[in-house]
Amino acid sequence: MLNFFAAAPRGYEYALSLELADLGASDIKESVAGVYFSASLELGYRITLWSRIASRIIFVIHKGPCESPEQLYNAAYGIDWQMEFNHRSTFSIDFHGMGGFINNTMFGALKIKDAIVDRFRDDDCPRPDVARVDADFRIDAHYRRGQITIGLNFSGPALHKRGYRDITGEAPLKENLAANMLMRSGWQKNPVSLLDPFCGSGTILIEAAMMACDMAPGLHRERFGFEHWLRHNDKYWQELLDEAKARASIGITRCKTKFYGSDIDSRIVALAKKNAANAGVLELIDFSVTNALNVKVPEETGYLITNPPYGERLGTVTALLQLYYQLGDKFKAEFGGWNLAVLNSDVELLSALKLKADKQMKMNNGALECAFNLYTVHATNTRRVDPSNINREGDVSDIAVPFVNRVKKNIKQLQKWAKKEGIDSYRIYDADLPDYKVAIDKYLDYVVIQEYTAPVDIPESVTKRRLTDVLITLPGAIGIDPNNIILKTREKQKGTNQYEKIQANKLELITTEYGAKFKLNLKEYLDTGLFLDHRLTRKLVGEKSKDRDVLNLFAYTGTASVHAALGGAKSVKTVDMSNTYTNWAKENFALNGLNDDKYQFVQANCMQWIKTTHDKFDLIFIDPPTFSNSKRMEDSFDVLRDHVPLLSSLIKLLNPNGEIIFSNNKRKFKMEIEALEALNFTVKNIDNQTLPLDFKRNPQIHNTWLLTHGG
């Protein structure tokens, strides 16, 4: 008996061990990312030809302890390589594993290469050449926990490359993954009708058809690793190939299983047909170009096994949640009695199906860890799902009802108000209900959802489910395309992380506010470039700016400065520490046709700039951060602790009877009024005057003060 190792992705070991047992292997032992087994040479060939799960079959030549470079060298040198391959053959080494004395795989490969070359030389034989690409003889070495395994890559190129697929779709599924799905779902033991409504390039259906008609997965491969092996028995191999061809020919004619595949992309369906034709199973599969929500249910019950789109593959998660909910609705309505198996990397998408899984497994799709869930579908009604209603109210009426009702009520009130006010960006929901802790802002035809950090006593699973329900129901509640929903997570700000990018891609819009135009960037940063709660504060700045010199400190994107300029300010100076936001402020001025020299922009640490400037102003708007410990600032800043010295430092910048509009977002902020009055300030709280209607539900969103200095 010979010793072999069947390599496979992690998570496939159990299915692979069952398959090897069915094929006749003995001494089966599961390991990490593979299975050891024993077999005769003929059985080794058979397993290589018939394994649907394995990635590679390794003929093990040596296995033993290895604790040093010398032991590794000696292990390789001790093999009689002239028994394995001819010196005229090229060879290569694939080394896997690190740890101990091996800090990189190249080191291990070079040690084995040196040992092989030295062994040929010491046996008075010319040394074979190394070929990095398309070597005749590929040596495979695995190092793990002080053990080295050296062997021949018996199978050659990865076994998932069956030979029937030349080109793949946008998000291909490996053939051995598809085979594993079919086996673990239970379909292989009960090959009834099979449907894949997201068939892509057809991999699941083709693999299933090959199983059903008894076709060896390696039958279409052109190359195997043992072909240049000196112990190769071509007679055995040719007999196995002839047997496999005969079995496939008989199996195709006898196959009664029906296969159905569809995809929304006609080009991908054409590719699936080509792949099926290459595999010799096209006549068994009924392909169609169809939206998954329009798929007709076959007359006979069976299995629906699929790998639908998910965030890493296609589309946005928000839009996909809508799709998954509709799919779950369709399954329950039309697929009663069917078995369902779904592969997905996002458990939140699977939860949107609103189906209870009979079994949940982990299964890798390449480097991506996925969930593979099995369901038995029980019919709940007989209505058909209309995919054209995907965003209309009623489709999701059975979940998050209080949230949906509140959002509908809010939007009905706010739409008329916003139109009257002359604004097209506003907040429609702000954690109104304790179970749904999100803020929802509408920017023209887009919505940004900000998820607040949940209390520690709320289980993460509950928080995720509630957020999923929000994302599913919101498009229908307010009549918006789910692709136009952006999700962000808002946590307590620390230092400068409001400046950090959260996504590489941009989504820029132009919004209008009381006649002013502002650029928005909905995706790239946590904030969008416009603080909606300060809308009336900006308007107030504009109303107070006519014929006055205005200063905007901690100016962000300069929106208050724009209002000041449009309000007729004599001059406007905009100061912010961020180069990004200073340039953004300049863009906002350009959008409004404000290109005069009297509008100046300063990128500087505001605290330092206040100390050094000699400019005077009639109106100062200052909206400092609640807390900051930026690297560009010498000391940290806390608005509660430091607001008095900050405001006192502005006195020298004020003209007689000058005013300061001071705002911050510190909840439970307490103004040191007596200390400020001692500095000759008149202090007035103007929260009610500056809190917009869309923020009335959350009066603590900010606090605003008007300070007038007596001179």
Curated annotation (Swiss-Prot):
Residues 43-154 form the THUMP domain. InterPro entries: 23SrRNA_methyltr_KL, DNA_methylase_N6_adenine_CS, RlmKL-like_Mtase, RlmKL-like_Mtase_CS, RlmL_1st, SAM-dep_methyl-trfase, SAM-dependent_MTases_sf, THUMP_dom. GO terms for molecular function: 23S rRNA (guanine(2445)-N(2))-methyltransferase activity; RNA binding; rRNA (guanine-N7-)-methyltransferase activity. GO terms for cellular component: cytoplasm. Keywords: Cytoplasm, Methyltransferase, RNA-binding, rRNA processing, S-adenosyl-L-methionine, Transferase. Its main location: cytoplasm. SUPFAM superfamilies: S-adenosyl-L-methionine-dependent methyltransferases. It catalyses: guanosine(2445) in 23S rRNA + S-adenosyl-L-methionine = N(2)-methylguanosine(2445) in 23S rRNA + S-adenosyl-L-homocysteine + H(+); guanosine(2069) in 23S rRNA + S-adenosyl-L-methionine = N(2)-methylguanosine(2069) in 23S rRNA + S-adenosyl-L-homocysteine + H(+). Transmembrane segments: none annotated. The keyword Transport does not apply. The keyword Endoplasmic reticulum does not apply. Specifically methylates the guanine in position 2445 (m2G2445) and the guanine in position 2069 (m7G2069) of 23S rRNA. This is Ribosomal RNA large subunit methyltransferase K/L.
